[in-house]
Amino acid sequence: MLRRAGILLRPDEAANLEIADLGLGDLEHVGLQIVVYVNTERCCAKELVLLPRQICPEHRHPPIRDYPGKEETFRCRYGRIYLYVPGPKTTNPHAVIPESRKSNFTVWHEVELNPGDQCTLRPDTPHWFQAGPEGAIVSEFSTKSIDEADVFTDPEIKR
């Protein structure tokens, strides 16, 4: 999918591709693939690769001591992504959630991102997203990423 999107990875980047099933063992439906280009004290850049209809489940990036939490911008590079954030509930959302997990999704304001579209989220904003039927690649640009501090709505998730 990365090649189709015109995104080339160096061998070391490809070797460090993270397959994140989030401890659920259901990667086909829930999880994502992550390429981290840089993650310093001040900035982070990643590619988030999602299979068709794959979900990155609801979570937020809370403050930690004197760090206000991660602010992030998502830019769609390939496919379509449905991003869900606080706001008025979308009447007919595109998301398809496994029935057994629906109670773990609380924000339903849909923002559709197509290639070239982007959306910025403030720290500690609950959000989740799902790829469209062809999968999706999203570039994430953010302040420092501390993935192990993410707070997921689903208590079964282990990061």
What is the predicted role of each segment?
Residues 1-46, 64, 99-103:
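A short, N-terminal "cap"/entry segment at the start of jelly-roll beta-barrel domains
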Residues 40-59:
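Conserved double-stranded beta-helix
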Residues 42, 68, 105-107, 113, ...:
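Residues that act as N-cap/strand-start positions at coil-to-secondary-structure junctions
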Residues 46-48, 65-76, 110-111, 119:
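His/acidic/aromatic-lined binding-pocket segments of jelly-roll/cupin-type domains
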Residues 51-52, 69-91, 97:
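Glycine- and acidic-residue-biased ligand/ion/polar-headgroup-sensing regions
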Residues 57-58, 66, 83-84, 111, ...:
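Short beta-strand His + acidic residue motifs that chelate non-heme Fe in jelly-roll/DSBH
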Residues 90-106, 126-159:
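Double-stranded beta-helix
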